[in-house]
Amino acid sequence: MESLWKLSYLLEPASLALILTAVSVAYASASRALDHGREMERNLDFSEASITLDRSQALMIPLASSCSLLLMFYLFSSVSHLVTAFTAVASAMALFFCLSPYVNCVRSRLGVGDPFVSRCCSKPFTRLQGLLVAICVGTVVAWLVSGHWLLNNLLGISICIAFVSHVRLPNIKICALLLVCLFVYDVFWVFFSERFFGANVMVSVATQKASNPVHTVANKLSLPGLQLITKKLELPVKLVFPRSLMGGLAPGSSPGDYMMLGLGDMAIPGMLLALVLSFDHRKIKDMSVSQDMPPSKQRKYVWYALTGYGVGLVTALAAGILSQSPQPALLYLVPSTLGPVMYMSWLRNELWELWEGSRPIINDKAHLLEV
């Protein structure tokens, strides 16, 4: 009975905010990936084309991630300034990518002119884009100075959406391979790394803070306002929500405690959602072209995957609460998202079509490798 009572912690404001944000970001990532692909096809502009993973790349991702994890575990204090600087640049670029469609939409609806100013990286650069760059850079600077968790989450969400939009899966075959490999990766580094390295590598890396290069420079130059600049930063590679959010605080928790979810636990399922959302829209388009085929009223695959993601995320949080120990989220998210999609496609006799995927658009800019 006590265990069931502990599950009420899932109704804390921090837990609910984490769940709702993660589900929304996973769907937003898939939707933005679909729109980005359409935009590239419509404009025949592949200078920002996506990378479509092949089998060898899917196998290399867990290995590369493991190497990065060990590097951060042993050498983080030595490279934290460099990592923070790289993350700041990537965050600004990702935020620009995410906000650009909204700026263009507002401009077109208001009929506001946006005169050409110059060329940047062989692309036209307008005044509104310049203003947006300033806003994005200002947001990153505000994060570097304050380290506020809301800004951290905003930048992390932007990175997640940009990643899913630019790194694609060609079919369920490669998707299943990637998810199973990352399933093993997550389980090993959370549950078994302590036996080999003397500490839980995943938890250690996820919870350590980076040194703030802005604070270091301000300190060396004895600049005024040094006390306003945070010394340590949570990098935007995870969502963080304070347990004291809106007055909620679980027994045994301190006001400084946070609930965390790694970006990979949103981005990897988001790649699956992007794949099935693209498949859903292609099926609808094929049916609209075919005159003798009635429009399908079947539920889209993306909703099965998204529902499974929500269920898997709640299950992962519940397991963490009941066990009082960190849980590998992909242990729950991989079967809860991939399973329903494969089962429903098998029932509809579309598993082979999803398994092999549609032929991608070949261009000299995109990195497309056929399996």
Curated annotation (Swiss-Prot):
A motif (PAL) lies at residues 328-330. The active site is at D186, D265. GO terms for cellular component: cytoplasmic side of endoplasmic reticulum membrane; endosome membrane; Golgi-associated vesicle membrane; lumenal side of endoplasmic reticulum membrane. Residues 1-6, 76-80, 147-149, 193-258, 323-326 are lumenal. GO terms for molecular function: aspartic endopeptidase activity, intramembrane cleaving. Keywords: Endosome, Hydrolase, Membrane, Protease, Transmembrane, Transmembrane helix. One of its GO terms (biological process) is signal peptide processing. It is a multi-pass membrane protein. Residues 28-57, 104-123, 168-171, 280-301, 348-371 are cytoplasmic. Its EC number is 3.4.23.-. The chain crosses the membrane at residues 7-27, 58-75, 81-103, 124-146, 150-167, 172-192, 259-279, 302-322, 327-347. Its main location: membrane. It holds the Pfam family Peptidase_A22B. It is found in: Endosome membrane. Belongs to the peptidase A22B family. Intramembrane-cleaving aspartic protease (I-CLiP) that cleaves type II membrane signal peptides in the hydrophobic plane of the membrane. The first transmembrane domain may act as a type I signal anchor. The PAL motif is required for normal active site conformation. This is Signal peptide peptidase-like 1. It comes from Oryza sativa subsp. japonica (Rice). The gene is SPPL1.
